[in-house]
């Protein structure tokens, strides 16, 4: 046995400290952004106008997506100037932001549960119509589910069957949305497409920013859960559509 083989054998025979391993697992686990930090940064960078600016960014996120550089190419000069001003003021980034980076989608997240009224009049925009998802599942797809940030409202303390139904119904949107915005995924296998959105989705679900009681209240208000905290029949049917996709 040479020196390196000996090192390998000795390493493999070392005792495992489960407490230390668990600490490492928690330290190295994927973490999404902290919504509290996003709010703090908005207030600090925006001063007195941060609330008005946040509303503008929420509208942009819901109607035009998460990529300011691309959206200004097809926008009125006035609108383009406003977007560029917001990008500069709040240091808005796109692509792969760091944990504390501000994106349009992240600005939406802290207030997603309170934005239900927006969906009632944002009916002509690409992301709020939902025609392709409704046509695909044969049900009226819940508009509140039609944004990646919705995962932050899914209550992980629901009964497993109902949690899975809400999760899989939302995955149908994420699946179709991912193929729409990422050309390389359009011919990909279902598992590969799901892998592309699973980490941020799970991070949002496991976030502590909105507690489970409040999440459940939002889901009930949106008609995604019944008053008894069960997934509605529509949500269950949509979930089945996703499960049958190949």
Curated annotation (Swiss-Prot):
- Return the InterPro entries for the record: Capsid_Phlebovir/Tenuivir (IPR009522), Nucleocapsid_Phlebovirus (IPR015971)
Q: Where does RNA bind?
A: 30, 33, 67, 105-106, 186, 196
Q: Which domain of life is it from?
A: Viruses
Localization in the cell:
Virion; Host cytoplasm; Host nucleus; Host endoplasmic reticulum-Golgi intermediate compartment
Is this entry keyworded RNA-binding? Answer: yes
- Example of a GO cellular component annotation carried by this entry: viral nucleocapsid
Annotated GO molecular function terms are: RNA binding
Q: Which family does it belong to?
A: Belongs to the phlebovirus nucleocapsid protein family.
Note on domains (UniProt): The N-terminus is involved in homooligomerization.
Tell me, what does this protein do in biology?
Encapsidates the genomic RNA, protecting it from nucleases. Displays high affinity for single-stranded nucleic acid. The encapsidated genomic RNA is termed the nucleocapsid (NC) or ribonucleoprotein. The ribonucleoprotein has a non-helical structure. Serves as template for viral transcription and replication. After replication, the nucleocapsid is recruited to the host Golgi apparatus by glycoprotein Gn for packaging into virus particles.
| Protein name (record) | Nucleoprotein
